[in-house]
């Protein structure tokens, strides 16, 4: 059934699904069903927080990811036209505003600038723009980056809560906070701020638009259903696959801080 979901470059399959899959793996490793042995000490409180140890490698990784993402979003149009250029521009702006926001937040909190903050902010901005790159204008993209950085940075605190400790849920890569929750926010925000006019820049695409610019309130509900369905599909499917793999002799593991 075609509900008319707006997802320009794959926010659900790229971000929500990957975050759900990583979360399912972390929970399964703490509570294995079959051959793997349960760890009695695996909690977020006893694990060492992994920090980048090589700034040069992190910088090169950020340049590689950021540059590739520009081609990824712009290339989604499968053509070289004004819409592809617009997609590239909003992607770059959203990543930049996200990086700046995260750095400023960190500076206000700890009093120093951080390349790690720039990296995480850029990633959160790129995640925010993925489903909406072909549907929003430059000013909206700028605020998307700010929103994504603030939201994802606060979401990082979840793994240090009592809830995470009780579930022995560990997320060193911050996949749940950035990709999963950030992807959900991006998908929902696309339904709110998508614009018919921007989508038609290629002269072909027609969409009903979003809530605020085109008055299409129904689109918000569609986007929420899409985000929830994508998460549940990947989480349940991945958890089932992990359990089946755990049944195979030789594949069992002991969950630890690795």
Specify the residue positions occupied by each region the protein language model found.
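Glycine- and aromatic-enriched membrane alpha-helices
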Residues: 1-258
């Amino acid at each position: 059934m075609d509900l008319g979901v707006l997802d320009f470059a794959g926010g659900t399959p790229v971000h929500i699904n990957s975050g759900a899959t990583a979360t399912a793996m972390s929970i399964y490793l703490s509570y294995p069903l079959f051959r793997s042995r349960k760890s009695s000490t695996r909690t977020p409180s006893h694990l060492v927080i992994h920090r980048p140890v090589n700034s040069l490698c992190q910088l090169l990784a950020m340049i590689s990811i950021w540059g590739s993402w520009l081609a990824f979003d712009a290339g989604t149009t499968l053509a070289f036209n004004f819409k592809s250029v617009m997609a590239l521009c909003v992607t770059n702006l959203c990543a930049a505003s996200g990086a700046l926001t995260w750095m400023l937040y960190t500076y206000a909190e700890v009093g120093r600038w951080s390349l790690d903050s720039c990296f995480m902010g850029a990633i959160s901005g790129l995640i925010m723009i993925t489903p909406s790159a072909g549907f929003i204008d430059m000013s909206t993209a700028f605020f998307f980056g700010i929103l994504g950085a603030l939201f994802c940075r606060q979401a990082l605190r979840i793994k240090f809560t009592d809830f995470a400790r009780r579930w022995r849920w560990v997320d060193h890569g911050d996949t749940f906070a950035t990709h999963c929750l950030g992807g959900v926010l991006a998908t929902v925000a696309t339904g709110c701020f998508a614009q018919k006019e921007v989508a038609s820049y290629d002269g072909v695409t027609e969409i009903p638009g979003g809530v605020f610019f085109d008055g299409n309130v129904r689109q918000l509900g569609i986007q929420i259903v899409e985000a929830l369905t994508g998460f549940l599909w990947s989480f349940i499917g991945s958890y089932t696959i992990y359990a089946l793999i755990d049944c195979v002799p030789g594949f069992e593991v002991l969950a630890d801080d690795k």
